[in-house]
Amino acid sequence: DKKVIKLGIGDVTLPLAPVVVEAMKKGAEDLAHKETFKGYPDYEGYEFLRQAISDYYKSFGVAVAADEIFVSDGAKSDCGNIGDIFSKDNVVLVTDPVYPVYVDSNIMAGRKIVYAASNEANGFAALPDENVKADIIYLCSPNNPTGSAYNAEQLKAWVDYALKNDAIILYDSAYE
């Protein structure tokens, strides 16, 4: 008998950080009072949240203006929506295993999917195959569901591949 490991979608394994719990409590309390109540945000997300994200990245020396940040309700709707800007004739490359929504949203749109195998031999970090042509590349690092993470050299290999093939990389930095 062997243990079966579910590799459909990654799952969190630790409780929420205390700072997150406190922020959620404060947010819930704010919703209970007319003076601090906030309804639905603008389409791109609350300004205060986008500014906080901008400030966070600035602390690492990365300049991203708040108006360049989009806060959404999650990857599922984003994957479907972002696909609408690409041609249905585009070939999509995903690593395997991968977050199922990347595959599902593109199959529903009628795009061809090609897979790059992530396995023990490559440390569960698939690298580009020069014999495969893709227009859109989904990279998730740390990978969902395996948790493997690309290093800078491996990411550069993907960027070089994308530049050579005039491809777009959709990068999901899950579990930051």
Describe the residue ranges of each PLM region:
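N-terminal small-domain helix-loop-helix segment of the aminotransferase-like
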Residues: 1-73, 81
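Residue-level detector of anion-binding/catalytic polar loops
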Residues: 3, 112, 168
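Generic structural signal for small/hydrophobic residues in well-ordered secondary structure
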Residues: 7, 24, 53, 69, ...
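Active-site-proximal loop/turn and secondary-structure-junction residues that shape catalytic pockets
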Residues: 11-13, 98, 143, 175
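Residue-level signal for alpha-helix termini/capping positions
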Residues: 29, 84-87, 163
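PLP-dependent aminotransferase-like
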Residues: 84-141
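Active-site phosphate-binding strand-loop segment of PLP-dependent enzymes
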Residues: 118-176
